[in-house]
Amino acid sequence: AAVIQDPAAREDENITATENAVSALGKLCEHQTQSIDAKSIFPSFLACLPLTEDAIEARAVHAQLARLLQNDTYKSYLLGENNENLARAILIFAEVMPTASSSDKVRLCDQETAMAMKNTLVQMQSTMPGDALAAAFSALDPQKQAALQACMA
């Protein structure tokens, strides 16, 4: 966690190591949940996303996020009590899902992951309190709202 939280973590000479550390943290969340303080580590992992510099790690970690959000136990750790991290998760989806007008995002998320994210959003629409989801979407700027709407079409 110290590597990820270091003030210099996002500087050019450190970004690859930082994104690899975030990837490792995600693997701990997914595969060693019982060995970590899940209520604090999962939100810390979410706060580090999206990955933007290492395309290989970005695709793997964003696919992992989609998997985690499709599992009720992991989802509860990621989103937190009262879905306090829901807006963050939706913002990440908006930033990484490819759209016709954002070809640079294609490298952050493959089509399979984009479909999993879309399915997760559809599932959230039917299972989460409407006011929580509406608040999360309204927290997005208009461009990100439009990007998500385009992905959902």
Give the ranges of each region predicted by the language model.
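Alpha-solenoid helical-repeat scaffold
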Residues: 1-153
